[in-house]
Swiss-Prot record:
InterPro entries referenced in this protein's UniProt entry, alphabetically: ARM-like, ARM-type_fold, CIK-Related_Protein, Kinase-like_dom_sf, Prot_kinase_dom
Modified residue annotations for Phosphoserine: 632
Organism: Schizosaccharomyces pombe (strain 972 / ATCC 24843) (Fission yeast)
Protein's name according to its UniProt entry: Protein kinase domain-containing protein ppk32
Occurrences of domain Protein kinase (ranges): 21-317
Domain of life where this protein originates: Eukaryota
Record's compositionally biased regions (Polar residues): 602-651
GO cellular component terms given for this protein: cytoplasm
PROSITE patterns associated with the record: PROTEIN_KINASE_DOM (PS50011)
Chief localisation class: cytoplasm
Length: 749
């Protein structure tokens, strides 16, 4: 006694110290209050079962039994329940993680995480069920239990009872909805062992129902076999009868096929009705196979009931969906080839399962086998498909942590793996926080640029255009585009080049590349392309046209349109492609032309200075503008001659001959007045005059009026830095008089 007392005291706070208990959320499982919890350090998800002894006096009502006896009786039932669960280990039984800890005020133990009792599960689904599988989006409609869920759960209870009756030699004696819990994976687990007994027990005593004790602490007559209640004869067949009552209650809002309200006389009447051959046939049940199953379990005569082994093979439990779930439960034991074949079939038929089955049963099993690299290509599609319906928080914590190592090393897997990840990129984008997506998924995309598979390369590039809603402009310009420029320059795969060009076009149209980035980075890359394959050429044409709407007009004139003409005459283009190029070029040219004309029209008009140009090869003087020149001819002549002040004496001597000739020419002039047609007539000089400085018109002289000799003007000294040549006259009409120094110019004075 002292040792037990010390043990209880020393362990009474272990659960409290080792687990974080969420007191705000709780469910009832029989007499136990159950809290969700997690183990400190490992974050293992568990449930903590607690019974508060302080409330026992409130629960126990006055009855025929002494209050202290009732209290001890109830506490012994609770201890037996936990000790039986701790001793019995089977996948279909509730698994105890921490044994019972008892103090003066409470009793507690820890199990694997559960959701609720089956009784509450049925109640929350309003007693509804569906035998039509999942809805169009793969999810169960409402809270109704799908029939395949029921089939799976019942098979799990059968497995547990087979273990109890066969290996453990134990009879449960308390099978009902409150003795079955649903765990976090949706599996049904058997509990409530307070009234269990050994098969070899000498006596099976049924205690009369005590209305002074809560019903959760007593057996329910509505779920007990008639031989046990009336004759105190029991065996495994008694559990079969209780199992039949459980099946019926699932389809009848937790109500057993017997409705005795724990009164013996009422019970006997109900059993008499049950013995009728048409009793079960009259019930509203979903299938004939289910009715046959109930007949095999609810026979009044124990000898006519089927064994648990026989129930397991009932036609009600046949079908592809339930067979797949049973295969999944034994998945670790299957051969690799069987696993691959099963997964291929499952991916095609996944939507036939209720979403609760997908998320709670199938998904955890698939995640547990991701360490098998041969199975990864078959597992990922199902994992992603199920993940579409998960909350973002659950996806991040449960699914993404399991698949991220595969995503990081995707290039080491067959191409099916990265292609599958790309296929479900929208799922990743919607479920992950944007920061986590950018830091973990975008690098995976970059890595696929260098993948050995052409499909993976092109898909990784094409996928970038779908991510612009979460990728900013800076990331595109500073991180993505440099990698695309490099890949575009080094790859010899035409499909990759076309994919990159398409991505550039998306970036431009979505305003992720500005004028500077296009002109400074993109156009030089495109200019180096030498291939003239039609797909590449047309891709480049599309990019150039899109860029032409953004970059300056001067760049369009200088770099884009010439390049488009070069590409358009590629001999590899078809007529249709060529015509398309021409349409695009004309469209761009027209747009630029209209834009430029509009700019010119918007400029303020300016006054153009009047000037007269002289054509040295024509006898006509042309006016540059419609207005007369503001410079008089005489003044213009004076300006020209004034520029000769720096002539050397030798130069002046040479020009005397030309001046004499010019005098002869001027004497023949009909009038000194300036007319619109006045001009000089120049002759070809003789060889003797070839070294003279002749006054010949130059292009710069066109800024001034024509030189008209005038006797009223005298030549003035010209600046040294300006040289004026004398006109060359015809030898046949003008002779040089070199002996007279300035005689030829005197006529001008």
């Amino acid at each position: 006694m002292l040792a037990n007392a010390l043990r209880l005291v020393s362990n009474s706070k272990k659960i409290k110290y080792d687990y974080d208990i969420q007191k705000e959320n709780s469910v009832q499982v029989g007499p136990w209050t159950v809290y969700s919890a997690s183990k400190k350090g490992t974050n293992e998800e568990v449930s903590v079962f607690t019974f508060d002894k302080k409330n026992l006096s409130t629960l126990l009502k006055r009855g025929s039994i002494d209050s202290n006896l009732k209290t001890n009786y109830v506490l012994e039932l609770l201890r037996k329940d936990v000790s039986s669960l701790s001793r019995l280990r089977h996948p279909s039984l509730l698994q105890v993680v921490e044994p019972l800890e008892e103090s003066k005020s409470s009793m507690s133990f820890v199990t694997r995480r559960i959701q609720s009792m089956l009784q509450d599960f049925i109640k929350s689904s309003n007693g509804g069920f569906s035998n039509y599988g999942s809805s169009a989006n793969g999810k169960s409609s409402g809270n109704a239990l799908e029939e395949v869920e029921i089939q799976k759960g019942l098979l799990q209870i059968i497995d547990g009872l087979v273990f109890l009756h066969g290996s453990a030699k134990v009879i449960h004696y308390n099978i009902r909805p409150s003795s079955v819990v649903v765990d976090a994976k949706g599996d049904w687990k058997l509990c409530g062992f307070s009234f269990s007994q050994s098969v070899e027990s000498a006596r099976y005593e049924f205690n009369d129902y005590d209305f002074g004790i809560p019903s959760s602490l007593q057996q329910s007559m509505d779920f007990l076999a008639p031989e046990y209640i009336t004759h105190e004869i029991a065996g495994p067949e008694s559990d079969v009868f209780s199992f039949g009552c459980l099946i019926y209650s699932i389809f009848n809002k937790n109500q057993s096929i017997i409705n005795a309200n724990n009164h013996l006389l009422s019970y006997e009447k109900e059993i008499t009705s049950l013995n009728s051959p048409t009793f079960i046939e009259s019930k509203n049940l979903p299938s004939e196979n289910l009715k046959s199953l109930l007949k095999e379990t609810l026979a009044v005569d124990p000898k006519q009931r089927a064994s648990m082994f026989e129930l397991e093979r009932s036609p009600y439990f046949t079908g592809s969906a339930i067979a797949a779930l049973r295969f999944l439960e034994s998945f670790p034991e299957k051969l690799p080839s069987e696993k691959v074949s099963f997964m291929e079939s499952l991916s095609k038929n996944l939507t036939t399962f209720p979403y609760r089955i997908q998320s709670q049963k199938i998904l955890p099993t698939l995640l547990d086998h991701l360490n098998d690299q041969k199975l990864v290509p078959s597992l990922l599609p199902c994992i992603f498909e199920i993940s579409k319906g998960l909350d973002s928080s659950i996806f991040s914590s449960k699914v993404f942590t399991a698949i991220f190592p595969i995503i990081s090393a995707a290039n080491s897997y067959p191409e099916r793996v990265p292609l599958c990840i790309f296929q479900y990129m929208d799922c990743l984008k919607s479920k992950l926080p944007s920061g986590e997506f950018l830091s973990k998924i975008v690098p995976f995309i970059y890595g696929c640029f260098e993948n050995s598979s052409l499909n993976v390369q092109t898909t990784s590039i094409q996928i970038l255009g779908t991510l612009l809603d979460i990728i900013d402009v800076t990331t595109v310009k500073s991180s993505i585009c440099p990698k695309l420029y490099h890949s575009f320059s080094v790859t010899n795969q035409l499909d990759v080049k076309v994919a990159i060009l398409d991505t550039f076009n998306v970036f431009i149209n979505q305003k992720f590349l500005d004028s500077f980035a296009i002109v400074d980075k993109l156009l030089p890359v495109l200019e180096k392309v030498k291939t003239r394959e039609p797909t590449v050429v047309m891709g480049m044409v599309t990019v150039y046209i899109s860029a032409g709407a953004i970059i300056p007009e001067e760049t369009v004139h200088e770099q884009v349109i010439p390049r488009l003409w070069i590409l358009s005459v590629s001999p590899s283009l078809s007529l249709e492609q060529y015509n398309k190029c021409m349409r695009e070029i004309r469209s761009l040219s027209d747009a630029v032309q209209k834009s430029h004309a509009k700019k010119l029209q918007s400029k303020p008009s300016s006054v153009v200075p009047n000037r007269i140009t002289t054509d040295p090869f024509s006898s006509q003087t042309k006016e540059a503008t419609s207005k007369p020149s503001s410079i008089s001819p005489n003044k213009a002549t004076t300006n020209i001659f004034t520029s000769q002040a720096s002539l050397s004496s030798q130069g002046v001597a040479r020009e005397t001959s030309s001046a004499s000739s010019y005098r002869s020419y001027s004497q023949r002039a009909s009038t000194p007045a300036v007319t619109a047609k006045s001009s000089f007539h120049y002759a070809t000089p003789t060889s003797g005059l070839s070294n003279f400085n002749s006054v010949t018109p130059s292009s710069s002289a066109s800024l001034y009026p024509p030189l008209i000799p005038s006797e009223a003007r005298t030549p003035s000294v010209q600046p040294a830095n300006r040289r004026v040549t004398t006109p060359v006259v015809n030898q046949n009409t003008v002779t040089s008089d070199s002996s007279n120094d300035l005689g030829g110019w005197k006529s001008l004075l």
